[in-house]
Amino acid sequence: MLDIKITRTTCPKEKPQDESKLGFGKKFTDHMFVMDYTEGEGWHDARIVPYAPFQLDPATVVFHYAQEIFEGMKAYRTADDTIQLFRPECNAKRMQDSADRLCIPKIPVEDYIQAVEALVDVERDWVPHSDGASLYIRPFVFANDVGLGVHASKHYIFCIICAPSGAYYAEGINPVRIYVEDEYIRAAPGLTGFTKCGGNYAASIKAGELAEEQGYAQVLWLDGVEKKYVEEVGSMNIMFKIDGKVYTAATVGTVLPGVTRRSCIELLKDWGYEVVEGKLAIADIMQAARDGTSMSLVSLFITANGTPMTFPKSFKQVFNFMRVYVPTEQTWLTP
């Protein structure tokens, strides 16, 4: 168990007055969680301190070789003023998988959750009250060695920051236009597609800009080998319902294992849907649409944003679990 030292700010920021204009990740709370790693000592000096910049040497490893990982999750305020987290252990375990791939020391699941809960408790007044808004939580780890040699760092910083946020897209949970990218790729077998690391996202910016220029909100990525099988959208997983079956790409190294994706699959199976995790060619999807086959799709944003589908029960139920709108037997919420 972490011994977290808390130093509260003496200059609190003004909180947003109009929650309908929050945007995403634009304004940050008063505090942040920080913990250091030193080879031979492990993770140490867990603390919550006033939000402030880091002072880093220009030769810090992360600037040059991108040895860093991150997560994304949310805290929700319920009708009875309780603050809830949605399946934080899934984010903690996924960060461990990312850490293993990037040669970063793992953070124990219980320590990750304790750190998140402690920071959210300090910042509970920043959790929005309105529907569709939440406190976005961004845990991240970066290499902190100084030097230009290419090797795993011996020092790291684990930090968590928070931002009261609205919908990721301006469209909210209304349908968005998605561009199918058949030139650039997001991931390939053996690389880091299943992790949350900055390099994956930096490499996606070019295609995202080209899509935006043509009026699209996001990019649908195809596989990196044959460029014909659907994998995921830039900020979300995606599913297709065709003739009663639900299809989605398997998370076998090139697709990020989304928490909302996992939750919807579990619910769909409980409700009797056949869920197929495997290869689905974009040509087959387009042909099904042309043939008038019974088909719909849902984009599963990790924060539960997405497009409506003809099996709305799954998406809405997951979102309702997050907001505690409906009772559930699922142990997915952490007060």
Where are these regions (language model features)?
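Residue-level signal for inorganic ion chemistry
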Residues: 66, 95, 160, 227, ...
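Conserved catalytic-core subdomain
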Residues: 1-18, 27, 166, 170, ...
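Glycine-rich, charged/polar anion/phosphate-binding loops
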Residues: 17-21, 47-49, 56, 142-147, ...
